[in-house]
A protein has these predicted regions:
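N-terminal, membrane-interfacial amphipathic/helix-forming hydrophobic leader that caps
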Residues: 1-79, 87
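Membrane-interface helix caps and helix-loop-helix hairpins in membrane proteins
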Residues: 178-184
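Membrane-interface helix/loop boundary segments of multi-pass membrane proteins
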Residues: 144-171, 198-206
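Hydrophobic alpha-helical transmembrane segments
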Residues: 8-12, 16, 52-53, 91-96, ...
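Juxtamembrane helix-loop-helix connectors linking adjacent transmembrane helices
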Residues: 42-49, 75-147, 154-160
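Alpha-helical transmembrane segments of multipass membrane proteins
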Residues: 139, 173-178, 194-198
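Functionally important transmembrane alpha-helices
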Residues: 23-27, 31, 185-207
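Membrane-embedded alpha-helical segments of multi-pass membrane proteins
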Residues: 57-61, 131, 135, 187-195
Length: 207
């Protein structure tokens, strides 16, 4: 019982630290911007939607800090031994499977009538039209999320659910979906979380 409580506490800590870093960095960037340009606090709410450069910068910085903290503390598993074995067939299968979940995720979205909020969708589109935004969304953020949700959270869940890996994978995928904060991303992130969780379980590597 003590072991269960300890593992749950660690998982809770990982989630809190991950979210706290995002919030603190966003407010630090936004606050600094408002002070520098002598803008009223009322502008804070829509600042990230209107200023894509600020959004990209805060996203990159918060992700890099997340990676640094989790690796420095030893909270995440990040072995490259599996990648060194050149498992190209497995990696190719994972890429194909990742592309393959797009159709069922779209189908589920249509079935449950869930859509990403318009402002958020527009923000992502604008970010993807910026080279640094593309790097942030396509490379840095996913790597930070893998460090946290597979390298740290799933690793603890696999210890907690010893002998029941699919329970651990499913729970970590649901947590991954919930953290994204809206129903549309919840479906996509949860399905992707199952795939990436399975890969982590089979390989012991987030890469």
């Amino acid at each position: 019982m003590k072991k269960i409580g300890k593992e749950i506490a660690w998982i809770g800590l990982y989630i809190v630290v991950f979210l706290l870093i995002q919030v603190v960095i966003q407010f630090a960037f936004a606050g600094g911007y408002l002070v520098y340009y002598k803008m009223p606090l009322a502008n804070l709410r829509n600042l990230f939607m209107s200023n894509i450069t600020l959004t990209i910068a805060s996203t990159i910085v918060s992700s890099l800090i997340t990676i640094f903290v989790f690796l420095k503390k030893g909270w995440a598993s990040h072995s490259r031994d599996y990648l060194a074995s050149r498992p190209w067939a497995t990696l190719l299968w994972v890429v194909v499977a990742a592309i393959g979940i797009i159709i069922p995720s779209m189908g589920l979205g249509e079935l449950f009538k869930v859509d990403m909020p318009g402002e958020l969708q527009m923000m992502f589109v604008r970010m993807m039209h910026n080279p640094f935004g593309y790097i942030a969304i396509g490379v840095i953020v996913p790597f930070a999320e893998e460090i946290v949700f597979r390298g740290a959270i799933l690793r603890n869940l696999l210890r907690l659910f010893d002998g029941k890996p699919w329970a651990a994978i499913l729970i970590s995928a649901i947590i991954f979906g919930l953290v994204h904060g809206n129903s549309a991303q919840f479906l996509n992130a949860s399905l992707l979380g199952i795939l990436l969780g399975w890969m982590f379980y089979r390989t012991g590597s987030i890469i």
